[in-house]
Amino acid sequence: MKFLDEAKVYIRSGDGGNGCVAFRREKFIEFGGPNGGNGGRGGDIIVEAADGLNTLIDYRYQQHFKAQKGGNGMGSDRHGAGGKDIVMKVPVGTQIFDEDKETLIHDFTKVGERFVLAKGGNGGFGNAHFKSSTNRAPRHANPGLPGEERWIWLRLKLIADAGLVGLPNAGKSTFLSKVSAAKPKIADYPFTTLHPQLGVVNSDGREFVLADIPGLIEGAHEGAGLGDRFLGHIERCRVLLHLIDATCEHAGKAYKTVRGELEAYAETLVDKIEIVALNKIDAVEPDELKKQKDRLKRAAKKTPLLLSGVTGQGVPEVLRALVAVIGEAPVSDKAIGTADNPAEAKPWAPQDA
């Protein structure tokens, strides 16, 4: 299934039905009086967070959603039927923004959560509603009220316990495929991973969700490489596993490049719990490995873990370290532009794939 993390959608709730002008007509009843029914209420547009979804791809093929109009009132005091609601299913982690892409309307954080995005118009009153002691035979009724319409943006930020970050070709996809059943594309060239990948990892009987975030390069927050379109997914990760390629020119500089991009995008990202690991240790000589480890230790101000995603060396230790810190991390880090502070929401270029 293709991955899509942002979509623009048009919605319109149903118009209310019109009220009816009618009078009772029966044999031997000279003054039957008004009996026009009220119009039905228009259908709502409802958004629901559904289990089993991890992409907004459905909204590439259908961008317009219009709820049903309420039925018109009829004689004999018959009221119009209510219009059918439309329920739009989205993955957990989806945010709804106004057309300006900055005003946050709602943020879905749990399965089954529902939000009424547009309410249907109320039905109009029939002439029976207007009967009074001074107006025994009203000959007017109300039209139904129109529904609400607007353009909105759906933006998905994947929710994972841990996120893999690093430069392109740091071995993130190889690591994910080694520790989970996920099958990301793996090749010896930059930007092999074009979309975030999720995998469920089991370590010593403890399960957690690991996300492989496409590689970042210098200037990513300004649109370089794959840009900052995936940095938003990191906001929802409780812990970061930062992988550095031991075969790169300078492990310390590689570490600082990624940290700089995270900080430039949002200062909250650098405050997350981070585990630093030097990958591909099987591909370098012992002397070079020691140099790279020392460089990385000075840059990160912590001793990095050593591992090889290909041979599996050091992988169990990294997983145990992740399990240990995931338990300490906040259950849900506050994302930029959440409902408490929508003004901080940052514009984000759509993922078009």
Swiss-Prot record:
GO molecular function: GTP binding; GTPase activity; magnesium ion binding
Name assigned to this protein: GTPase Obg
Subunit structure: Monomer.
CDD domains, per database record: Obg
Annotated EC: 3.6.5.-
Disulfide partners: none
Organism phylogeny: Bacteria, Pseudomonadati, Pseudomonadota, Alphaproteobacteria, Hyphomicrobiales
Species, as recorded: Rhodopseudomonas palustris (strain TIE-1)
Gene that encodes it: obg
Intracellular or extracellular location(s): Cytoplasm
A cellular-component GO term for this protein: cytoplasm
